[in-house]
């Protein structure tokens, strides 16, 4: 199984997993990590993006039969102040994954910082053009899927509403399940038929996100 654990401490898993980290230059700002049972063949931490390249936002590991990529997509910020940078990032990340997929199947997981469709957040009308639900970000995610990738959760549950992976700390949002689905497992289309399960572990606490899970035969 492949998992994304946003808040699990490395010491808890040290004895069982190989740890691969990608750090931001700015201490405490951002970063990604992958814990794997096997040593990767190679690790890629930069994607040639003109923005956010020193923020530890990608941790890509090559294994014998596939690429596994953990990503933390830049947030567009209040008022979409960082939207232009976000669009540059989305374009480069899409190209990066597409290049990897030419070699072997790709699994990409992480915080993509976008609710793709109205079903993916509780209040789409009042959040329209807010960061994470702007037309531009949603179109960018559509282009990523169109480049040859499958949203594993929606493949299995195309009509499931009220399934979220992030909740604001304000207004008892998690208790009321006023959330967003912004954490995904994407699978290259050539391997999408091997997906056997996808879950959102919303009973697991530790941050404003919860883990997401993919089961796939690779």
Question: What do the PLM-derived regions correspond to, one by one?
Answer:
Residues 2-10:
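Short, small-residue-biased leader/transition segments that mark boundaries at the very start
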Residues 9-20:
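Internal alpha/beta domain cores that form substrate/cofactor-binding pockets in large enzymes
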Residues 12, 25-28, 36, 52-54:
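Generic structural signal for well-ordered secondary structure
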Residues 15, 29-31, 57:
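A generic structural signal for short beta-strands and their flanking turns/coil linkers
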Residues 18-22, 197-199:
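A short linear hydrophobic-aromatic micro-motif
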Residues 20-29, 47:
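A short, structured active-site edge motif that brings together acidic residues
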Residues 27-33, 141-142:
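Short, charged, surface-exposed secondary-structure boundary motifs
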Residues 38-218:
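Active-site regions of metal-assisted phosphoester/phosphodiester hydrolases
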């Amino acid at each position: 199984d492949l998992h994304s654990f946003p808040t699990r401490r490395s010491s808890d898993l040290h004895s069982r997993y190989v740890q691969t980290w990608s750090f931001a230059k700015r201490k405490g700002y951002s970063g990604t990590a992958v814990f794997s049972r096997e040593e990767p063949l190679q690790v890629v931490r930069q994607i040639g993006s003109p923005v956010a390249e020193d923020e530890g936002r990608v941790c890509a590991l090559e294994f014998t039969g596939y690429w596994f990529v953990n990503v933390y997509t830049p947030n567009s910020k209040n008022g979409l102040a960082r939207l232009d940078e976000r669009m540059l990032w989305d374009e480069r990340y899409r190209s990066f994954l597409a290049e990897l997929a030419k070699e072997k199947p790709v699994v990409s997981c992480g915080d993509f910082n976008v609710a793709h469709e109205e079903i993916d957040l509780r209040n789409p009308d009042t959040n329209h053009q807010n960061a994470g639900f702007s037309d531009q970000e949603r179109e960018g995610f559509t282009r990523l899927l169109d480049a040859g990738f499958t949203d594993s959760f929606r493949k299995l549950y195309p009509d499931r509403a009220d399934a979220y992976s992030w909740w604001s700390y304000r207004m008892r949002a998690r208790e009321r399940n006023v959330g967003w689905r912004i954490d995904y497992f994407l699978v290259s289309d050539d391997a999408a038929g091997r997906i056997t399960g996808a879950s959102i572990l919303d009973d697991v606490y530790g941050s404003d996100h919860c883990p997401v899970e993919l089961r796939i035969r690779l």
